[in-house]
């Protein structure tokens, strides 16, 4: 798969929050942009030009531009005698001293357990505590809201700060630390909040590392019977890993500075270029991957499995922190989809229809009316890889599942005698040979003479059919290769009798780590290449996309060359058998030959000079090598190239011929989790509601009414005879029925003295049995009635107005003044399903219900086929387009950047990246969305599907009914 292009998505700009220096920032808030623009800030006199180059300018979410003062790193601030110390520094040093004193005071029998608990506490404070704060800050700017709500950064002389002592302490603390270009009173709230946050981070990080080192000291020792050579080797390797870890941290801090080190862009952005340098060219997420090598070096020096296990646990927790906290924020901040190109209808999206030929066959109708799709590469509608893509209606998945079940049965039901072991090893070797040599030959012939595609074209099939068949062949071959290897490893493996004997436990740990490394590498390769690149799509479609190096390919040209086979060698470590060593050597040799003889020539032919010679890791290593070693490296490359050329000539002369198959199984059950997390009782009640009259509270709704057929579906022919007519209603109010996904405006009233922390939530009517207390979580479907009342900005999204005095007349004809307001529920604050719902007005941030709206129904209307002529394809398609367009717009939150304005307009890029949008449309329309690209293609797919199914339709108007047997005389 080498350096193949990524066929889908946009190259991610960063690999971790701490891995980037800065990014040209954009205001992401809704507040007013300050009139002092960045350009005005940069207009400095010529005499100050030298100083201006050193300045960094930050931008808050509301657009305010400020100068970011230079700051010192954590270790220098705390440990350097030349740095001024303040109360927080002394406090941190005192805590560290208490840790060291505790190690000296505790008896040896309690040290290990005590420091294990202490380290786990600080690690949880890091990954869970800091992670939660950053998550809340990223999604709702919670930390900044806390600061603004408490007014701790406001000068007490204004009379708005109720904490003057805290203000003075913070001002002295921060101005002592940052003496240049910084004013506590003039700095934005976001920057001051970040400075306070980083002091908390300093405490947690220093205590985390110190407690880990003390735990290693408590566990450290020398194994019985260890030789001096082994002792020296263990300490040399351990110290090397620690020094490497130290270099990684220092080089990373050199690149990203304090801004990214302390997650600065959760608070504000800085206007600088994005840079990747040094350690960031070597590995993805270096702070969290190779940056933890020192943990394993310390484990090696301590010679303790306890230290090793707790190191693995800490490392895993750090990766969870990366995946759950940093990566979502990076995607949201730095990888925003580009705006959709708004183009007029072109020939690529027009329907080639011939209404006069509609009387012909269904096949010809479909061919003539299909949208002309671009032939650059196939649109991936039904992926193969991944458990969530398993489709038991697909022959490929059926074949793979049956083959895996057969392998599992043979492996578990046969004895592990030498004869069976030999058969399983031979089977694994044959599958590996086929996977590399056979598949390699097919790809080589496809590259040179389009052999695979020509075969299918010869029998009247298209190149897309050849591509689908190839994917099945490769997929089955790959799964059978790894299944046979796993079966052979299982047959050769014997369960250890004594886990403490020798290096048995260490071998299993290292083996499992290598297997996990291969799984991660494979998933990273697939994430970078997509389905098109994974199955060597550029061998089948010449119009390949531009070559890009994203994801893992930023660091390695061919990650499968070494890391892609790490799991094979992990199995060798676990089993410790010569047979597995043979299979591993065979696999590695054939993989290298495949890359050199099949992939590399095709890539050079296809991409030519645009191919990168050295990846980021190689460039970094070459820069650090002396000239003599660089010459040796060049000589080795020359020898390898000549050897592979000889092998290539030999294989070209032999031309072996081999054949094919298919893979996968499982079903996605995530739909269950969409419904049941709300079934948790979380009620918080206000004990004193005296002084509030429930008659003053009210909720009224405004929304988009659905199409007329949706309102009359209840009175259909499937009901009883007396229920087929419209219901007679006493009174003026009609049933509230709103469109699926359409925004709903909520108007509320409340007493003038109502709490500023009141809020309105959206619920299913059946969720709450009580009308006085809400007993289930709103799951984010709520809006505050007043601004700045909660520690999050997401709860204010949709708020239009608050506390507008309105005079109303009660039922007892008494006129009174009440507070009123409006809000709009849309997007993620709506339920994306059908049902009956209600809004509830809650008091003072609790779950006491003060008012409940009228129940309303969300309904998806059925398309009325009787309003158009069934035989007129053009009219049917146009009617389907008109019916689909508003549904799709609602599902895309009516966002002009992603929602189409016409049937021909393509969806925005965010639809492909965030699956919730396509799932909404699939629920409403029950047809594939993402691959269609626009409403016109979706309508075409529906219309032609109806043509194919017309002979089986139960509707007399639109197709023949189910055939019945007639008795003839």
UniProtKB/Swiss-Prot annotation:
Classification via InterPro entries: Phopholipid_MeTrfase (IPR007318), Phosphatid-EA_MeTrfase_fun (IPR016219)
Cited PROSITE patterns: SAM_CHO2
Membrane topology (Lumenal): 1-89, 135-199, 249-281, 326-399, 443-473, 520-564
Main location (coarse class): endoplasmic reticulum
Enzyme nomenclature, EC number: 2.1.1.17
Biased composition (Basic and acidic residues): 714-725
Cytoplasmic side: 111-113, 221-227, 303-304, 421, 494-498, 586-969
Composition bias type Polar residues, residue spans: 1-15
Subcellular location per the Swiss-Prot or TrEMBL entry: Endoplasmic reticulum membrane
Region described as Disordered: spans on this chain: 1-40, 705-725
Pathway: Phospholipid metabolism; phosphatidylcholine biosynthesis
GO biological process: methylation; phosphatidylcholine biosynthetic process
Keyword Cell membrane attached: no
Residue spans crossing the bilayer: 90-110, 114-134, 200-220, 228-248, 282-302, 305-325, 400-420, 422-442, 474-493, 499-519, 565-585
Pfam families documented for this protein: PEMT
Membrane topology: Multi-pass membrane protein
Disulfide bonds: none
Keyword field: Endoplasmic reticulum, Lipid biosynthesis, Lipid metabolism, Membrane, Methyltransferase, Phospholipid biosynthesis, Phospholipid metabolism, S-adenosyl-L-methionine, Transferase, Transmembrane, Transmembrane helix
Catalytic activity annotation: a 1,2-diacyl-sn-glycero-3-phosphoethanolamine + S-adenosyl-L-methionine = a 1,2-diacyl-sn-glycero-3-phospho-N-methylethanolamine + S-adenosyl-L-homocysteine + H(+)
Record-level GO cellular component terms: endoplasmic reticulum membrane
Described purpose of this protein according to its UniProt entry: Catalyzes the first step of the methylation pathway of phosphatidylcholine biosynthesis, the SAM-dependent methylation of phosphatidylethanolamine (PE) to phosphatidylmonomethylethanolamine (PMME).
Family assignment from sequence similarity: Belongs to the class VI-like SAM-binding methyltransferase superfamily. CHO2 family.
Protein known as: Phosphatidylethanolamine N-methyltransferase
Species this protein is from: Ajellomyces capsulatus (strain H143) (Darling's disease fungus)
Lineage of origin: Eukaryota, Fungi, Dikarya, Ascomycota, Pezizomycotina
Gene behind the chain: CHO2
């Amino acid at each position: 798969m080498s350096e193949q292009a990524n066929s889908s998505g946009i190259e991610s700009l960063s690999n971790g929050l701490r891995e980037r220096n800065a990014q040209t920032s954009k205001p992401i808030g809704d507040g007013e942009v300050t009139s002092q623009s960045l350009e005005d800030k940069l207009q400095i006199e010529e005499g100050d030009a030298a100083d201006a180059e050193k300045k960094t300018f930050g931008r808050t979410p509301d657009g305010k531009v400020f100068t970011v003062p230079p700051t010192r790193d954590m270790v220098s601030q705390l440990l350097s005698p030349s740095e001024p110390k303040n109360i927080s520094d002394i406090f941190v040093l005192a805590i560290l001293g208490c840790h060291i004193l505790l190690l000296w005071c505790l008896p040896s029998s309690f040290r290990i357990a005590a420091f294990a608990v202490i380290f786990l506490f600080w690690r949880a404070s890091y990954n869970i505590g800091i992670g939660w704060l950053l998550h809340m800050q990223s999604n709702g700017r919670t930390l900044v809201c806390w600061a603004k709500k408490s007014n701790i950064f406001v000068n007490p002389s204004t009379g708005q700060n109720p904490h003057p002592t805290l203000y003075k302490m913070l001002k002295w603390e921060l101005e002592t630390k940052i003496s240049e270009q910084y004013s506590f009173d003039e700095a934005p709230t976001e920057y001051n909040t970040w400075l306070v946050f980083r002091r908390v981070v300093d405490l947690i990080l220093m205590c985390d590392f110190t407690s880990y080192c003390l735990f290693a000291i408590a566990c450290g020792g020398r194994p019985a019977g260890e030789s001096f050579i082994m002792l020296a080797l263990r300490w040399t390797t351990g110290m090397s890993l620690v020094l490497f870890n130290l270099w990684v941290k220092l080089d990373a801090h050199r690149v990203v500075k304090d801004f990214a080190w302390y997650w600065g862009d959760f608070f504000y952005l800085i206007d600088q270029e994005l840079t990747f340098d040094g350690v960031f060219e070597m590995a993805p997420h270096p702070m969290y991957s190779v940056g933890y090598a020192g943990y394993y070096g310390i484990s090696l020096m301590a010679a303790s499995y306890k230290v090793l296990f707790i190191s693995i646990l800490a490392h895993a927790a750090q990766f969870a922190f990366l995946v759950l906290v940093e990566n979502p924020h990076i995607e949201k901040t730095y990888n925003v989809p580009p705006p959709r190109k708004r183009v007029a209808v072109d020939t690529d999206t027009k329907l080639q229809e011939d209404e006069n030929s509609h009387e012909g066959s269904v096949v010809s109708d479909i061919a003539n009316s299909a949208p002309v799709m671009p032939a650059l590469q196939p649109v991936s509608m039904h992926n193969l890889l991944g458990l969530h893509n398993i489709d038991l209606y697909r022959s490929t998945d059926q074949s793979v599942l049956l083959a895996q079940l057969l392998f599992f049965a043979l492996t578990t039901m046969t004895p592990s005698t030498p004869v069976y072991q030999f058969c399983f090893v031979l089977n694994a070797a044959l599958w590996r040979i086929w996977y590399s040599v056979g598949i390699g030959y097919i790809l080589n012939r496809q590259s040179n003479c389009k052999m695979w595609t020509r075969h299918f074209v010869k029998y009247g099939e298209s190149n897309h059919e050849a591509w689908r068949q190839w994917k099945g062949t490769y997929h089955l071959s790959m799964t059978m290769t790894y299944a046979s290897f796993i079966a052979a490893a299982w047959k050769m493996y014997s369960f250890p009798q004594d886990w403490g004997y020798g290096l048995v436990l260490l071998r299993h740990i290292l083996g499992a780590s290598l297997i996990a490394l291969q799984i991660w590498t494979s998933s990273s390769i697939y994430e970078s290449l997509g389905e098109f690149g994974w199955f060597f799509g550029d061998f089948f479609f010449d119009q390949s996309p531009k070559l890009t190096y994203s994801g893992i390919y930023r660091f390695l040209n061919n990650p499968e060359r070494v890391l892609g086979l790490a799991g094979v060698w992990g199995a060798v470590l676990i089993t410790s058998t010569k047979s597995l060593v043979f299979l591993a050597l065979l696999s590695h040799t054939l993989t290298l030959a495949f890359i050199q003889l099949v992939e590399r020539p095709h890539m050079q032919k296809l991409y030519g000079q645009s191919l990168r010679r050295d990846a980021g890791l190689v460039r970094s290593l070459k820069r650090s090598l002396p000239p003599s070693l660089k010459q040796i490296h060049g000589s080795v490359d020359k020898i390898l190239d000549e050897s592979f050329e000889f092998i290539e000539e030999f294989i070209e002369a032999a031309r072996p011929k081999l054949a094919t198959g298919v893979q996968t199984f499982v079903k996605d059950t995530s739909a269950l989790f969409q419904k049941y997390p709300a079934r948790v009782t979380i009620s918080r009640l206000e004990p004193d509601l005296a002084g509030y009259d429930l008659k003053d509270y009210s909720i009224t709704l405004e929304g988009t009414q659905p199409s007329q057929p949706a309102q009359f579906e209840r009175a259909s022919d499937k009901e009883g005879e007396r229920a087929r007519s419209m219901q007679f209603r006493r009174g003026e109010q009609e049933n509230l029925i709103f469109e699926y996904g359409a925004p709903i405006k909520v108007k509320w009233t409340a007493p003038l003295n109502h709490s500023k922390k009141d809020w309105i939530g959206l619920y299913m009517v059946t969720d709450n049995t009580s009308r006085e207390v809400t007993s289930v979580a709103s799951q984010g479907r709520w809006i505050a009635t007043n601004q700045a009342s909660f520690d999050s900005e997401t709860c204010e999204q949709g708020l239009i107005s608050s506390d507008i005095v309105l005079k109303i007349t009660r039922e007892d004809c008494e006129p009174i003044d009440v507070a009123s307001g409006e809000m709009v529920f849309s997007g993620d604050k709506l339920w994306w399903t059908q049902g009956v719902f209600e809004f509830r007005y809650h008091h003072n941030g609790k779950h006491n219900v003060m008012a409940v709206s009228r129940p309303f129904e969300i309904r998806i209307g059925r398309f009325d086929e009787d309003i158009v002529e069934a035989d007129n394809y053009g009219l049917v398609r146009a009617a389907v387009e008109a019916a689909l367009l508003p549904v799709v717009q609602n599902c895309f939150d009516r966002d002009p950047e992603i929602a189409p304005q016409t049937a021909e307009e393509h969806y925005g890029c965010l639809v492909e990246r965030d699956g919730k949008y396509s799932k909404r449309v699939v629920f409403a329309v029950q047809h594939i969305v993402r691959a269609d690209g626009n409403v016109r293609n979706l309508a075409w797919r529906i219309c032609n599907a109806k043509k194919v199914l017309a002979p089986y339709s139960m509707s007399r108007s639109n197709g023949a009914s189910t055939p019945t047997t007639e008795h003839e005389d």
